[in-house]
Amino acid sequence: NSTSSIRAKYETLRDAEVEAGATHYTALECWNETDGAQRSYALSENVTMNILYQRFYEEKASDENDYSVCLLITQGTKNYLFTGDLEHKGEESLVKSNDLPACELFKGGHHGSPTSNTPGLLSVIQPQIVCVCCCCGSDEYTDNVENMFPSQAFVDNVAPYTDRVYVTTIVADNAAGYTSMNGNIVVTSDGVTLTVNCSGNDLI
């Protein structure tokens, strides 16, 4: 949200880093490789961060979530996809504009929202492991149980590809507050095998 306190804090910290000598690029600058920006950045000897294209980097969106920056991390033959809060129109553009590979890891879009994680995207990436950052069962945004994060539509769309879905937090009773589900989800890879370790539990 362009007017939120979180956005303001981000901009303050970003501007401070730039003033201290860091270089800031937008996703579109990276995709177009302008002013020294690159589409791909080597994070280590065998790990690369790739900026993916989606049309709302340069078009006006009706939903601010569609301005999300999308990344593909590659480690040898392993692929890890991050789409932020990208909605269905953005996902459609993402699939159309990029040669997306099958992905060993997918960070579930928009907290498992029914307006993201579309069959069109999932049928291409066919994720093996999905991690969702949300409070499962919370009615903060809706009273409709089917649409509470992670939504039933999300579960139905992911189910053909994997049952390895991890969720950070859960709530059964608002009065009792939130409790850890899987908790902090740590995915590690030796380049061959992915291992998931969670601070709460390893249930899927």
Positions of PLM-derived features:
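Non-globular, low-confidence helical/coil segments that flank catalytic cores
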Residues: 1-204
